[in-house]
Structure formats: structure tokens, C-alpha cells
Amino acid sequence: MKARELFEKLKKELNNFSIYDIMMIRSFIEKDAKYLPPQYKNHYVEAMMKYLIETFNEIRKKSVDEIQDEEIDEEKLNEMLNRIERFRKYYTPDEERFINLSKILCPYLAFIAKKPLHPEYLTFPGNVKIIKKGNNYYCPVKNKQLNEYSLCEFCVCKSIDELK
């Protein structure tokens, strides 16, 4: 599959989301963040919602002609989508909306925009952030989150260890 074809598909699916859906997704993110350390919880929710809305609007405003039409690794794309499906814990309508939007935003970020799956302005526990150096991104938690449920292997970020 080519990047423009994927972008058109993602953009079309994005049109199914309303402000009501975004409000439900925020509710889900707040609920899902309940186990984060209190000092990070509010920041995490705010940063993730800001990035979600920025990415949402970026897709809406971008035209297909702006997309570099390179080949997308469909096997990796399908693995990412399957992992997102496995995020389910609660089987609630707000979680369903979150899953469906993640299946649009994450492939866009990873395969088309080539941006991190978390925003650069998100502070992770330990008071660390993603660092951009030149055209490369370095993540402080990438090596700590590589498991069958994470999306880290699809993210453009390199491990921060590569900076040292």
C-alpha cells in the first residue's frame, strides 16, 4: 500500500468523529490514567489530549498531495492495528472510540508523518521527555516499554541510549 492511499483511508475514517467523540475519548484517557503517579496524571491527560487534537487537525487540514507517496509496510501496519485492538480492558463506548481513533492517529504518526507516538512536550515519570536532535527523535522510555502490547517498535523514536 502507498502512503497516499493509507492517508486517504485514514482521513475518510476521521470524518466519522465528532466533538462528542473527542469528549468521550478524554473521559477514557482520564479513567485509564488513574494508576499514574498523581504528579504526572493531569499533565499526561492534558498533553495526550493536546497531541490528539493537534494530530486530528493536522490530518483534517492536510491534502493528499502533501503526502510523500512511499510504500507502507502493510505487515507492520496490520501488526500495529492488531496491537491497538488488544488495548481493550473495559469494553466501554468511550474505550471503543479511543481504540478507533488510535487506529487512525497512530498509523498516521508512525507511517506518514514520521512523528513520535507521544508528544515531545509529554513529561514521563522520572521527569524525562522525548528529545529531537536534527531529524531524529530519542525516547527515554522506548527500551523500557518493548512488549507485546506496546507500540514502541512502530514509533520513529530511537532509544535515548543512542544519544550517549
Curated annotation (Swiss-Prot):
NCBIfam families: PRK01022.1-4. HAMAP family: UPF0305 (MF_00763). It comes from Methanocaldococcus jannaschii (strain ATCC 43067 / DSM 2661 / JAL-1 / JCM 10045 / NBRC 100440) (Methanococcus jannaschii). This is UPF0305 protein MJ0646. InterPro entries: DUF2115. Transmembrane segments: none annotated. Belongs to the UPF0305 family. Pfam families: DUF2115 (PF09888).
